[in-house]
Amino acid sequence: NNTAMQKTVFTKEQRAIHKLIVDSIGMSDIGLFDGKMGIILSLITYSRNTKHKAIEEVADFLMNQVLNNMTNISPLSFSNGLTGIGWGIEYLIQKGYMPGCGADICSEIDKKLMSCDIRRVDDLSLEHGIYGWLHYIVAHIQGANRCGKQVFDRMYIIDLISKINEY
């Protein structure tokens, strides 16, 4: 019977989404550039644009994995560390894709970031340095303002501005 053997044809976009989902299964990296947070952003955007609820559920499942494992990673880098994950969380909240307040969800990230003496950081790169941290810090302050919260103390902001002014 030929109708029972019909082949499903997927678009390039659908194949890419399916590959992301399969790749995420055994993935240990939860970061933004090469990990689960980056995949979550792709899946959420796709699911909202296509109204594909199952894809959104996969993204929610992955987000729970990220949130449960955030405290297990220590790099502050934007590419594969905490500031990239925090930026992703803020992006999802501010776009209305995720409920909550980033100030509450990312408080541990903020503590780790403020415990680092920014005056001694020499890396300015997006991937691992201050430029990446700034992406998180600016988005996070915007999100915190919407929640009526303050996320960084005055001294940290003064040191950050001072460091930026060096360059």
For each predicted feature, which ranges?
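Solvent-exposed loop and edge beta-strand segments that line ligand/cofactor-binding
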Residues: H18-K36, N68-L82, I118-I130, Y167
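A broadly used, surface-exposed interaction patch
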Residues: M63-D104
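Low-complexity, Ser/Thr/Pro/Gly-enriched N-terminal "stalk/linker" regions
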Residues: A4-F61, N165
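Long, compositionally biased, intrinsically disordered segments
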Residues: M5-F10, N72-S74, L92, R120-D122
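Eukaryote-skewed repeat-based solenoidal scaffolds used as protein-protein interaction platforms
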Residues: M98-Y167
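Alpha-helical solenoid scaffolds in eukaryotic proteins
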Residues: R15-D23, F61-N69, E108-C116, D159, ...
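Well-ordered alpha-helical scaffold segments within catalytic/enzyme domains
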Residues: I39-K51, G86-M98, W133-C147
